[in-house]
């Protein structure tokens, strides 16, 4: 209230009714790297946005990638040999695993069409240059998606203005825009990003 002209951002993994008025961006917390987890993120994001939280995001690629070898990844819990329930990723070699690279690229593609585009995690590098070199498929796909996100910024900014002026949400269930279409009601793995882009992530 003392700085009404300031735009705030509060990135948090939890919130409460009406916390969106305080610049809250919710994210799904420290998730682990698996195809199933990535698919579930679509439902989680739609549920949050339908609950009135217009800004939602996730850890692209999963926060945790490994399962067995977490003690060697430099976390502060490395001296405790007790298995950690949360360290459940499917990729012991992290970015060196081509399976993880494919998952990461697909998750990255989904992230382009979220209110906040955010790659974050522990136990493996996530910078683009760790996924190959120019001319190689994983690297090139990531670069193209970064460029696409930048091209979408005027559209994203316009939709952000609608959140303020019209109580809008960027990540939209198909029920919002196609309420009369019974097929749309049955689709939980697609969503609208604003009013012009239909998104169906590869999961």
Predicted regions and their residues:
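Catalytic-domain carbohydrate-binding cleft regions of carbohydrate-active enzymes
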Residues: 1-203
């Amino acid at each position: 209230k003392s700085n009404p002209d300031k735009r705030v951002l509060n990135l948090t993994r939890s919130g409460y009714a009406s916390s969106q008025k305080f610049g809250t961006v919710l994210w799904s917390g420290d998730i682990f790297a698996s195809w199933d987890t990535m698919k579930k993120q679509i439902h989680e994001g739609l549920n949050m946005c339908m609950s009135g939280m217009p800004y939602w995001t996730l850890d692209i690629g999963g926060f945790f990638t490994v399962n067995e070898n977490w003690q060697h990844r430099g976390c502060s819990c490395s001296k405790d040999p007790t298995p950690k329930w949360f360290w459940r990723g499917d990729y012991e070699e992290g970015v060196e695993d081509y399976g993880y690279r494919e998952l990461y690229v697909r998750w990255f593609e989904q992230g382009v069409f979220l209110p906040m585009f955010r790659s974050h995690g522990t136990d493996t590098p996530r910078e683009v240059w760790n996924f190959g070199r120019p001319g190689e498929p994983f690297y090139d796909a990531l670069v193209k998606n970064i460029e696409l996100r930048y091209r979408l910024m005027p559209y994203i900014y316009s939709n952000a203005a609608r959140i303020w002026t019209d109580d809008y949400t960027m990540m939209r269930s198909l029920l919002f825009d196609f309420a009369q279409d019974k097929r749309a009601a049955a689709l939980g793995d697609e969503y609208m990003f604003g009013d012009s882009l239909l998104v169906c992530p590869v999961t």
